[in-house]
Curated annotation (Swiss-Prot):
Residues 308-354 form the G-patch domain. Pfam families: G-patch (PF01585). The lineage of its organism: Eukaryota, Metazoa, Ecdysozoa, Arthropoda, Hexapoda. This is Zinc finger CCCH-type with G patch domain-containing protein. InterPro entries: G_patch_dom (IPR000467), Znf_CCCH (IPR000571). PROSITE patterns: G_PATCH, ZF_C3H1. Residues 256-279 have a biased composition (Acidic residues). GO terms for molecular function: DNA-binding transcription repressor activity, RNA polymerase II-specific; RNA polymerase II cis-regulatory region sequence-specific DNA binding; zinc ion binding. It comes from the Eukaryota. It is found in: Nucleus.
Length: 512
């Protein structure tokens, strides 16, 4: 009775734990924690059920023992039959002795396996053997030397492997041999292997082989086209029919190199290569995912190579480096390049630390890159300021470029509108230096010489065309325009020479 009392105490403890788990489930909304609580609840319920069966079994054995002890006549008759069987070995009534029944304590270590997942073998009709994920639903521990487990396959690939829905509900009218579906397969516990968790990260690779659940509950082979890890859905192209379906991750089983169903035409080398490709793609996907969690750096690693051929970055990319990730095979190294620091010359480290403290701990205080950027910004501002000053400044060269040299592209009508501007610009001649006036006078003389040569060339061409023709008229217009430009240049030369004469007279008067 002490064993039954211990089991009753265990049942009470299990019920208290089950109540605590249900209370925790009410306060948990979703996520992996809720899934673990649901699994724990199912395990506790299964444990309570098994413990109750054990208590009932022990109570039944005690009652049978009491009944057999009270009936002495039956025991005496049984004893006499056994004596007669020993005296007459050839007697028809002789029966072999029953094997010793396995005690409940010896079966106890195997009861924890009920409800657990494993990888169990299945022998197909054509004789091939393959392992599939399965669930242990019961155990046959009558012989401790050969304990058998009844399993139901989680991802059945053929009809004889699909669990019978009516059998699970207890309503199937057929026995194990007559039913088209599976009532569970008895497999030696020594042949079971560890359960393989689905590796959904393999779905990131396009072309990954998977088993997909059909409407008839049979899992068929397919190929991944796209996968969305936010909605937990993926598009699969089935090998049979070549049609595409969209399924949740829970209805998909990614196949690794060892899980792909083998055939006579497939070789082991192909599966090994696919497994290696999956490992490489998985590592690269993990590196990319880790790089997305890093903050965006201010400077790209290898940014200095824009001034070179960039051979270093090309070599790193061929070696598997992912842009934006850290250095190293797993992308756990530095992302931001080490910045060069230039400390003040002839100063101690204490003085440099004091300067950094005064700058509120600025890490870029002695950075070479930051210093070059500051100098670049200062130079850009200085250049912009000088450009604005030069643009607003009016001298004789601006006057020549805008009024004299630029008038060759204008028409006679535009020349009339430029005359007032020329008069205004002539008022700026006193602000020009004597050197600039001399250079401007030289340029005007050179421009006048070129215009006179153009007039001679056009006049020579004019003699080759008949008067009144279109070409003759165009040449006359060009000659008139050149002469007008010469007239403008002469006026400007006169203004410059007059300004120079005024300066000479003023200098002489000053000396006098």
């Amino acid at each position: 009775m002490s064993g039954s009392q211990d089991l009753n105490d265990s049942i009470r403890i299990y019920n208290e734990q089950l109540a605590q788990v249900e209370q925790a489930l009410e306060g948990t909304s979703s996520g992996p924690e809720r899934e673990s609580l649901i699994n724990l609840k199912s395990d506790l319920e299964e444990l309570v059920k098994l413990t109750l069966e054990t208590v009932q079994h022990e109570n039944g054995d005690d009652l049978n023992a009491a009944a057999s002890g009270s009936n002495e006549d039956d025991e005496f008759a049984l004893f006499m039959r056994e004596i007669n069987a020993l005296d007459d070995p050839g007697s028809v009534d002789a029966k072999p002795p029953k094997p010793d029944e396995v005690s409940v304590d010896e079966q106890e270590p195997f009861k924890d396996l009920v409800g657990s997942k494993c990888s169990a073998p299945h022998i197909h009709k054509w004789g091939s053997k393959s392992y599939h994920n399965a669930l242990i639903c019961s155990l046959d521990a009558s012989d401790l030397d050969d304990v058998a487990a009844k399993v139901l396959f989680i991802n059945p690939t053929h009809q004889e492997m699909v669990p019978c829905a009516y059998f699970l509900e207890g309503d199937c009218k057929f026995n194990d041999e007559m039913c088209r579906f599976s009532h569970g397969e008895l497999i030696s516990i020594n042949e079971l292997k560890e359960y393989r968790e689905p590796r959904f990260e393999l779905l990131r690779k396009k072309g990954c082989k998977v088993l997909a659940k059909n409407r008839n509950r049979i899992w068929s082979k397919g190929t991944i086209q796209t996968a969305d890890f936010e909605t937990k859905t993926c598009k699969i192209q089935m090998d049979e029919g070549r049609h595409e379906v969209e399924l949740q991750f829970e209805n998909v089983l990614p196949l690794e190199g060892d899980d792909v169903p083998s055939s006579d035409s497939e070789s082991n080398s192909d599966s090994d290569e696919e497994n290696e490709d999956d490992v490489v793609s998985l590592q690269q996907a993990q590196i990319i995912e880790r790089s997305l969690l890093n903050p965006a750096p201010d400077q790209r690693l290898g940014d200095w190579e824009k001034h070179t051929k960039g051979i270093g970055s090309k070599i790193m990319l061929k070696m598997g480096y992912v842009v934006g990730a850290g250095l190293g095979s797993k992308g756990e190294g530095i992302v931001v390049p080490v910045s060069a620091q230039v400390l003040p010359q002839g100063r101690s480290l204490d003085y440099c630390m004091q300067l950094r403290e005064q700058a509120n701990g600025d890490k870029n205080l002695f950075s070479v890159e930051k210093k070059l950027q500051r100098e670049k910004r200062i130079q850009e501002k200085r250049d912009a300021k000088n450009y604005a000053a030069n643009k607003s400044k009016k001298d004789v060269f601006n006057f020549l470029n805008s009024e004299i040299f630029g008038s060759s592209n204008g028409s006679s009508s535009s020349s009339g509108s430029k005359k007032p501007a020329a008069k205004d610009n002539q008022m700026d001649l006193p602000s020009c230096s004597s050197k600039n006036l001399n250079i401007a006078s030289l340029k005007l003389s050179e421009q006048m010489r070129r215009l006179e040569l153009d007039i001679d060339r056009l006049s020579h061409s004019l003699t080759r065309h008949q008067p009144g023709s279109k070409m003759h008229s165009n040449l006359q217009k060009q000659i008139a325009e050149k002469r007008r430009e010469i007239s403008e240049i002469k006026k400007t030369e006169y203004s410059i020479s007059r300004e120079q004469q005024l300066r000479n007279d003023k200098r002489k008067m000053t000396v006098f």
